[in-house]
């Protein structure tokens, strides 16, 4: 289950995600499926963003089905198609100098998309993972500024980044909207989440 609705321009994305989860659960229960694998977000903060709170709510809905649920909770996924990665790539490739918001100092534990795919395929019909939740992440913990500079180094680009202490969520969202390829609604929801640490509390899945 890979669905999210943060890009929606109409209505409340949390309500839409809830409805989608209920519809999916009800449809799957009419089949002979033994397991559902849900790719969620790391939710180890006491105070959650709307995005991560919705992810947690969806997990609760999916777990109430007649099948076994396996939840993989990831932070920043590094790879084409990941909204967070698209932001990193667009910012680095378009801006030689950045005056950026303070959430660039927020710590996260990124994971490569190839590793996410390995985990997703590895838990399929693995009964040890039935009705279990796992945090998945790479070996490095870094902030968003470090991610930008690391990507710039890989691309062979020289970039300078200055972080300002004050920049509202709305202003940050417009900054991403005008510079990157993502929609304003997605930018706003992601900026809200980027103020919260996303670090694994454990990663026992790699031992299975």
Where are the regions a protein language model picked out?
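Active-site beta-alpha turn of Rossmann-fold NAD(P)-dependent dehydrogenases/reductases
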Residues: 3, 37-41, 73-75, 137
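Conserved catalytic-site region of short-chain dehydrogenase/reductase
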Residues: 42-53, 76-82
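Substrate-positioning beta->alpha
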Residues: 20, 83-84, 103-125, 132-135
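NAD(P)H-binding glycine-rich loop region in Rossmannoid oxidoreductase-like domains
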Residues: 1-31, 41-47
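Conserved beta-loop-beta element that borders a ligand/cofactor-binding pocket
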Residues: 40, 60-81, 87-94, 99-102
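Mid/C-terminal beta-alpha module of Rossmann-like enzyme folds, strongest
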Residues: 119-187, 197-208
